[in-house]
Amino acid sequence: DVYKRQKNPEREIKEIPGYKYKDVYLYANGKPQELDGAYAVDPTHPSSEAMMKRTSELFHRAGFEYVKMDFMTHGAMEADKWYNPEIQTGIQGYNYGMQLLDKYFGDMYINLSISPVFPAHYAQSRRIACDAWNKMKDTEYTLNALSYGWWQDKVYQFNDPDHIVLRDATDGENRARVTSGVITGIFIAGDDFSKGGSKEVKEKAMKYLTNAEINAIANGQSFHPVDGNGEKSENQ
């Protein structure tokens, strides 16, 4: 588990020999900054750039043109200090790290997840909320995020409604989830379409993801809510 490896302070960073994870944590009051089960790392530490460079080289060799960057908020967390003494705030650290990201991945389509809304000029798209899967509650969650976050497609090129997952869901749930993605502006298929993937899921995908008239609606623009002043959220 990547979280368990990353949260072992004495573990050497495999990709960057000579550094241990404890060397790159962001500390507040002497303790590692933790959020959502993972420790934040210092974007100004040399090992952070080295890992970006190494990963970028791998992705470019493999021919990838798209990269999803997750848990970006960790890079904006406040700390007692940063490796680079010129950095004094979390957002300064985030900007520093994002400039490196642009340096190594700037020729790719970058999709940010769990990230600050601003600064926004380092990526083409940003996930409009957190994880949304395949059930009706996930559709409700996405629509709630769209109701109050539609304007972000004026900040980024695209709002990302999270991957559309069809497996283990009813036809009605599939249709609703596809709709929630289409009206957000784009959607990304999230099931396993490899040779070993589920035949049922592939059939569902052919049924729900190949409707030309529906797909034409997903043109990168988010729908605007008729009423944006509601007082209740999903499931209420």
Where are the language model's segments positioned?
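Short, small-residue-biased leader/transition segments that mark boundaries at the very start
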Residues: 2-3
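Conserved beta-strand edge residues that scaffold enzyme active sites
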Residues: 7-8, 73-74, 117
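Short secondary-structure transition/capping segments
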Residues: 8-15, 79-83, 122-124, 203-205
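Glycan-recognition surfaces
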Residues: 11-50, 54, 92-199
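Active-site groove signature of glycoside hydrolases
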Residues: 52-81
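Short hydrophobic/aromatic residue motifs in ordered secondary structure
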Residues: 73, 187-188, 211
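Active-site cleft segment of glycoside hydrolase catalytic domains centered on the general acid/base Glu
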Residues: 77-91
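Non-catalytic C-terminal accessory modules of carbohydrate-active enzymes
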Residues: 195-236
